[in-house]
Amino acid sequence: MAEACGVRRMKLGSQGLEVSAQGLGCMGLSAFYGAPKPENEAIALIHHAIHSGVTLLDTSDIYGPETNEVLLGKALKDGVREKVELATKFGISYAEGKREVRGDPEYVRAACEASLKRLDIACIDLYYQHRVDTRVPIEITMGELKKLVEEGKIKYIGLSEASASTIRRAHAVHPITAVQIEWSLWTRDVEEEIIPTCRELGIGIVAYSPLGRGFFASGPKLVENLEKDDFRKALPRFQEENLDHNKIVYEKVCAISEKKGCTPGQLALAWVHHQGDDVCPIPGTTKIENLKQNIGALSVKLTPEEMTELEAIAQPGFVKGDRYSNMIPTFKNAETPPLSAWKAA
């Protein structure tokens, strides 16, 4: 295993935001990956991350829902807030038990105010639209976010799972600081359009699930150990008919990591780190030992030949199964109507 080293700092985007080169995805502490973790343990892990130099903390109002933001708010008391860059998201509503993606101005503002209250802070550092509302022109959503920047409620604007054309349209209204997207050795379709678009526009790239939702940390046995309400149980890539094929990638990563003297997870994470100085992966974990391993990936150095070898075993399209079920929108269905089509209620 590669030992943890200091976490370098990096510029995210072109508007002045500086963050740790690796962030902490906080979702799994409260939602989707089984039962919520005990509050004291979750806060201890967050504090350990910050003490180790991981200062970009990523949450969303949908994690819990809402409870993850409350947890972060508690963890940032007593002067801790000033030590971190805090990112949260809006855009997925569960009002009256109905799941809905919303980007209308009224909802954008209400969601921001609610997040500020739950987090118990005056300003959000990086505020993402979690999913794109395909009924509302992105210019309308961005217009309200721009107002929130001007009012000092948020500092920087981000998009998550947005298409290349939506990113361009949004960026024309107000600079986008970061696009959060799934990027890992087994999710590489973003390399075709999303990544080049971000780089052309000077937008930072935040890679979520850089360990393939834990697959590269544990391999196929991950599925056997998932709690009954872990949403990964339903993901296409973890179904038996696809897993038998996908484990080939893990086995080859294991072979290379053994030669490198690091874990498979560290190797997979190092591959993301080596994509460029504009890329910040945000692996999540519920265990301090795993956090240390993730930070250790920063010390794994890969040669161009090793990068080529890794990419050859995980070429785009090789992995079987979609990232999500058909019910969850992604950048592939994230176009919005033209601004001329908008009629405010």
From Swiss-Prot:
Q: Which UniProt keywords apply?
A: NADP, Oxidoreductase
Signal peptide (residue range):
none
Q: Which parts of the sequence bind NADP(+)?
A: S209, P210, L211, G212, R213, G214, F215, F216, A217, S218, G219
- Enzyme Commission code: 1.1.1.-
What Pfam family is a match, any one? Aldo_ket_red
Output the CDD domains linked to this UniProt entry: AKR_AKR13D1
Name the active site residues. Answer: Y63
Q: Which GO cellular component does the record give, naming just one? A: nucleus
Induction (free text):
Up-regulated by iron and sulfur starvation.
Residue numbers binding substrate: H130
In the record, what terms sit under GO molecular function? oxidoreductase activity
The family line of this record is: Belongs to the aldo/keto reductase family.
Name of the molecule in the record? Probable aldo-keto reductase 4
